[in-house]
């Protein structure tokens, strides 16, 4: 396996997540968030010659990290199309799936992507820069009520209405284009002592809306349930409560949209067995080495 990579993204909860997959030598696995390839490399280390790994990523930058290995296939796509591409590759069942839902550190640190309030650049925030609305597009076109809903749902903010109103007023004067433009609008609404936390919530809400992240996560989980063989495992690393609640609920019930089945006693009839009833978090040592692992939570389930 060629281990060259254009950047050194540190994979979070690497051992814990791949251990959780219980990789079998000849199995078929999917890393739906390939990114820098860290988790994929570890899965390949544990796969035998007859096993295969599919790596999904919609970000064109991730293609620079593809390694040469006949056991690996890269799929340039959002993971919400998991079932479509597995069918295209004639894969009917998989033995395991891993997802690390965090935004790569290389993206946070790239001022041209607009993911972070720490770097001044254009407000883009798209994972796939070839299509879709940018963060600036949303701020300049969404109605005030739609902006309120976005900040309420995805940022869990208490002052969503005030922020949304200020955005609408500001864009009447001039178009919002850069991170600095946005920060200037937000300044009166961020309390001293909680600046970073509140800005992180606001930027999170905008990023989730730009990339339709929660909708994509739901779709991927539903498809993963259908693809996993009995005994196959799914390991998901989340970074905020919205994602974690979705994953926890899905592992418990196996559904989002359908009627949730219960037994005679009212217990959920889930297609999954929970492997770790307590979420797995990064050790103190890992947090020191990689501070962005601090908020990571790992949940693992096995298809019954």
Swiss-Prot record:
A Pfam family it matches: Methyltransf_5
Binding site for S-adenosyl-L-methionine: 37-39, 57, 85, 100, 107
Residue ranges the record marks as coiled coil: none
Gene3D superfamilies on file: Putative methyltransferase TM0872, insert domain, Vaccinia Virus protein VP39
Its EC number(s): 2.1.1.199
Domain of life: Bacteria
GO molecular function: rRNA (cytosine-N4-)-methyltransferase activity
GO biological process: rRNA base methylation
InterPro entries cross-referenced by the UniProt entry: RsmH, SAM-dep_MeTrfase_MraW_recog, SAM-dependent_MTases_sf
Single GO cellular component term: cytoplasm
Protein's cellular compartments: Cytoplasm
Catalytic function, reaction form: cytidine(1402) in 16S rRNA + S-adenosyl-L-methionine = N(4)-methylcytidine(1402) in 16S rRNA + S-adenosyl-L-homocysteine + H(+)
Keywords, comma-separated and alphabetical: Cytoplasm, Methyltransferase, rRNA processing, S-adenosyl-L-methionine, Transferase
Listed SUPFAM superfamilies: Putative methyltransferase TM0872, insert domain, S-adenosyl-L-methionine-dependent methyltransferases
Main location: cytoplasm
Assigned protein family: Belongs to the methyltransferase superfamily. RsmH family.
PANTHER family linked to this entry: 12S RRNA N4-METHYLCYTIDINE METHYLTRANSFERASE, S-ADENOSYL-METHYLTRANSFERASE MRAW
Physiological role: Specifically methylates the N4 position of cytidine in position 1402 (C1402) of 16S rRNA.
Protein name according to UniProt: Ribosomal RNA small subunit methyltransferase H
Lineage: Bacteria, Pseudomonadati, Bacteroidota, Bacteroidia, Bacteroidales
Gene that this polypeptide is encoded by: rsmH
């Amino acid at each position: 396996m060629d281990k060259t990579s254009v950047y050194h993204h540190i994979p979070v909860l690497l051992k814990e997540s791949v251990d959780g997959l219980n990789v079998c030598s000849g199995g078929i696995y999917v890393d739906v968030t390939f990114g820098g390839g860290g988790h994929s490399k570890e899965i390949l280390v544990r796969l035998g010659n007859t096993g295969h790994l599919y790596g999904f990523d919609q970000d064109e930058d991730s293609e620079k990290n593809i390694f040469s290995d006949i056991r690996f296939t890269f799929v340039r796509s959002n993971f919400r199309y998991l079932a479509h591409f597995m069918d295209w590759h004639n894969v009917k069942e998989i033995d395991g799936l891993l997802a690390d839902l965090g935004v790569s550190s290389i993206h946070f640190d790239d001022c041209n992507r607009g993911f972070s309030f720490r770097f001044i650049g254009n407000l883009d925030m798209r994972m796939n820069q070839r299509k879709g609305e940018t963060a600036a597009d949303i701020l300049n076109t969404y109605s005030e009520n739609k902006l309120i809903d976005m900040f309420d749902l995805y940022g869990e903010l208490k002052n969503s209405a005030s922020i949304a109103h200020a955005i609408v007023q500001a864009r009447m004067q001039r178009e919002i284009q850069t991170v600095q433009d946005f920060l200037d609008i937000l300044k009166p609404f961020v309390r001293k002592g909680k600046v970073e936390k509140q800005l992180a919530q606001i930027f999170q809400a905008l990023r989730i809306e730009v990339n339709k992240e929660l909708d994509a996560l739901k779709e991927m989980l539903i498809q993963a349930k259908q693809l996993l063989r009995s005994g196959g495992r799914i390991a998901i690393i989340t970074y905020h409560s919205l994602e974690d609640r979705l994953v926890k609920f899905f592992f418990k019930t196996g559904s989002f949209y359908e009627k949730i089945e219960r037994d005679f006693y009212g217990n959920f009839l889930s297609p999954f067995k929970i492997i770790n009833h307590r979420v797995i978090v990064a050790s103190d040592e890992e947090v020191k080495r990689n501070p962005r692992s601090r908020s990571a939570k790992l949940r693992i389930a096995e298809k019954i």
